[in-house]
Regions:
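N-terminal ligand-binding/catalytic initiation module
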Residues: 3-123, 131, 141, 282, ...
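Adenosine-phosphate binding glycine-rich loop
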Residues: 14-18, 245-336
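Short helix-loop-beta connector
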Residues: 137-144, 166, 227-228
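Glycine-rich Rossmann-fold phosphate-binding loop(s) that bind the pyrophosphate
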Residues: 150-151
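NAD(P)-binding Rossmann-fold cofactor-contacting core
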Residues: 164-187
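Short acidic low-complexity segments
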Residues: 191-207, 220-224
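An anion/phosphate-binding loop that grips the pyrophosphate of nucleotide cofactors and donors
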Residues: 207-208, 249
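Rossmann-fold NAD(P) dinucleotide-binding segment
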Residues: 209, 216-233, 243-244
Length: 336
C-alpha cells in the first residue's frame, strides 16, 4: 500500500530512481548534509577501497570498488554505497564506467529497507557538491566557468551549478572535440550566457571556477594558467593539476580530510610528504556549518577537492526511498 512502512525491502531500478528525485532537491539535500558533516550529526567513515586492477597488475580487471558507509542525522538513515569503475571488459561492452548500488537500513532496528541503483544518485550528488562548495565561497550570483570533460559528469556539474548561479560564460575543453560540441548544444538552455568550445586546454582555465571531470592521468592544468580569484575543482580520479599549483594554492578545501589526502588530486603530494592535514584550511562541512569562512578574494587561488562521501549518497537515497514509499513505487523483497 502507498505510504505504509513494512519490514520488506524495496528495490528500485535506475529508471525508477530517476523519476523520484530532481537536481534541485539534490542540491538542497547536499547542503543540509554538508551542514551535518560540519556540526557532527553526520557520521562518515573513510571509504574502503578494493583495487581490482586500477593501479595494480593483479587482478587484471582495470577496476576498483569502494565501500562507503554513512549515517545521516537529519534523515535518520544509515546505509552503504558499494560502487566503483571499470575500464577493461566493462568498457569494451559499452557499459558506463561507474557501477553502483546503495543499501539503506532502518538505523534503529537494522533491517534492510531499500536496495537501489546508485549510479544516477552518484552523478547528481557529485555535481551538487561543487555547487554547494561554490555557494559557501563565492559572493556573487553570476559566474564564469571553465570546464574540462564534456561527458556525463560535465553535464551534471553544469546542471547543478546552474541551480545556484547564473552561468554567464562557460568555456569547455574535451580531448574529443565532438563531445564538447555536443555538450554545447545540449546545455545551451542551462547556461545563461555563451558556451565557448576551446581547442587548447589553456583556454578553458578562465573563470570564477574551473571544474575538471576527466579520467586523465596527466597533470594538464598548469599553475601559470590559474589566475588569482579562481577556485579550482579537480574532480577526476587522478591529479589533473600540476604539482606547482597544488603546492602554491592559497587555501585547500576538502570534503573529507581522510579521503582527500589519499585519493585524487592530493594523493601524490601527500605520499611525498609535501601535503599534510596541516595544509587543509577547512572542510566544506565547516564552511556549511559556519564554523569557518572562506569567501574567495581577488588575489587568492583556492584548490577545492570534493572526493565524494557516502553521506551524500545515503542522504539522497533516503529522500528517494521516502518518495518511493509515498508513491508506491518499487518492487518488494523479504530478505529475512
Amino acid at each position: 500500500k502507498k505510504g505504509v512502512l513494512t519490514m520488506d525491502a524495496i528495490l528500485l531500478s535506475q529508471d525508477e530512481v530517476k523519476g523520484l528525485i530532481t537536481m534541485k532537491e539534490v542540491v538542497e539535500i547536499c547542503n543540509k548534509t554538508f551542514q551535518g558533516l560540519g556540526d557532527g550529526t553526520v557520521i562518515n567513515p573513510t571509504k574502503v577501497n578494493l583495487d581490482l586492477g586500477e593501479t595494480n597488475p593483479f587482478p587484471p580487471y582495470k577496476g576498483f570498488m569502494n565501500a562507503m558507509p554513512a549515517y545521516v542525522g537529519w534523515a535518520d538513515t544509515a546505509g552503504i554505497k558499494w560502487a566503483g569503475g571499470f575500464l577493461g571488459k566493462r568498457k569494451e561492452m559499452g557499459l558506463p564506467y561507474i557501477t553502483s548500488l546503495i543499501l539503506l537500513i532502518d538505523s534503529e532496528i537494522g533491517y534492510f529497507k531499500a536496495v537501489m541503483d546508485g549510479a544516477h544518485i552518484t552523478n547528481l550528488r557529485t555535481g551538487a557538491q561543487t555547487a554547494n562548495a561554490l555557494r559557501y565561497m563565492l559572493n556573487k550570483k553570476s559566474i564564469k566557468l571553465g570546464l574540462y570533460g564534456a561527458g556525463m559528469q560535465g553535464h551534471t556539474q553544469t546542471h547543478a551549478i546552474s541551480q545556484l548561479f547564473d552561468i554567464e560564460e562557460l568555456r569547455v575543453y574535451d580531448v574529443y572535440k565532438e563531445a564538447a560540441l555536443k555538450f554545447a548544444e545540449n546545455m545551451k538552455d542551462v547556461v545563461k550566457g555563451e558556451i565557448i568550445v576551446v581547442d587548447n586546454p589553456k583556454d578553458a582555465a578562465v573563470g570564477d571556477a574551473i571544474v575538471a571531470v576527466t579520467q586523465s592521468k596527466d597533470k594538464f592544468i598548469r599553475n601559470e594558467w590559474v589566475k588569482p580569484g579562481t577556485i579550482v575543482f579537480p574532480m577526476g580520479s587522478y591529479q589533473e593539476c600540476d604539482d606547482e599549483f597544488i603546492l602554491s594554492a592559497d587555501k585547500i578545501i576538502v570534503d573529507h580530510i581522510g579521503q582527500a589526502l589519499h585519493r585524487g588530486a592530493l594523493a601524490e603530494s601527500t605520499e611525498k610528504g609535501k601535503i599534510t592535514e596541516e595544509n587543509i584550511f577547512a572542510t566544506i562541512g565547516e564552511l556549511a556549518a559556519g564554523k569557518k569562512e572562506c569567501h574567495i578574494s581577488d588575489d587568492e587561488r583556492i584548490l577545492c577537492v570534493p572526493i565524494g562521501t557516502g553521506a551524500m549518497d545515503i542522504a539522497v537515497a533516503s529522500v528517494v526511498y521516502k518518495n518511493a514509499i509515498e508513491k508506491g513505487i518499487g518492487g518488494k523483497y523479504k530478505f529475512a
